[in-house]
Curated annotation (Swiss-Prot):
PANTHER family: 39S RIBOSOMAL PROTEIN L10, MITOCHONDRIAL (PTHR11560)
A GO term, aspect molecular function: large ribosomal subunit rRNA binding
Keyword field: Ribonucleoprotein, Ribosomal protein, RNA-binding, rRNA-binding
Top-level division of the source organism's lineage: Bacteria
One GO CC annotation: ribosome
Recorded family membership: Belongs to the universal ribosomal protein uL10 family.
Function: Forms part of the ribosomal stalk, playing a central role in the interaction of the ribosome with GTP-bound translation factors.
Organism: Sulfurovum sp. (strain NBC37-1)
Keyword Transferase: no
GO biological process: translation
HAMAP family: Ribosomal_uL10 (MF_00362)
Protein name: Large ribosomal subunit protein uL10
Amino acid sequence: MTRTRKEELVAEMTAEFKDAGAIIVCDYKGMTVENLETVRNLAKDEDTKVKVVKNRLAMIALQNAGCEAVDFKDTNLVIWGDTQVLPCKIADKAATQFKDHFTIKTGLIQGEVASMETINAMAKLPTRDELIGMLLNVWNAPVQNFTIGLQALADKKESEA
């Protein structure tokens, strides 16, 4: 890779890391290409990005983005996205699906290093769309119960008549 290409890559990652809600660093040692593609497809479905990057370039991009320092060693796969929950969910799903070869090393939430407990807890949270669905169900329940009651009352009066 040429120096100019490395600089372009760092600039691109810096811009994306600045806007990222969460950045998860994972170890993928021993994974097959098919398994990596599965992880990439999980991320693509959720509008999240996955990239295997050189350690030094990733460190420079994180520093330029104003994030806390992360020590990159061995093989690293970086998962990031605009939201805080989705990258955590994807990393957790991949870690459970490929237990032997995929582990979450560390993560950054809003540019600050997060503990593994935080990352695991965020992976268990519902997504924005799921939360909206839950809220709509809560709002819909009283109206639905009211209409069921009215229908039962109408049926009762009809049977009496």
